[in-house]
Amino acid sequence: MPLKLKVNDAVATVDVPPDTPLLWVLRDVLNLKGAKYGCGMGVCGACTVLVDGRAVRSCMTHVGAVVGQAVTTIEGLSPDGLHPVQAAWESFDVPQCGYCQAGQIMTAAALLARTPHPTDAEIDTAMSGNLCRCGTYPRIRQAIHEAAGAVANK
């Protein structure tokens, strides 16, 4: 049975079983490669996307569960240029290997949408489910603080 999804403000109809992981639909059906497969168990955060503004692990979310909700991937985070979090990521040279970055950025964007001026503790709590094998955590925190001002002024 075809499922109608709203992904990055566009409607897409996909013909997959409703228990298919959202990550596979995004990557293999819709050709949106930003969200990455890391662990397949929802613990690394590389596959994080937004569903109605909430950060979710797309490897553990069935596509049928997001019908009627807005899915945003890194490709759709800011269609008119860089989102403030993306700009701050560049400014603070956060990426090294880059594998985790889409998930990190999506989690940070969700945090700033609900907590415009987070403390270090709030950042650490929100980002704790996103692993970075390169260890750029201090730069991630700095970038989120930098982006907070830009997001609040948007």
Residue ranges and their predicted role:
Residues 1-154:
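Signature of N-terminal electron-transfer/Fe-S-associated modules in redox systems
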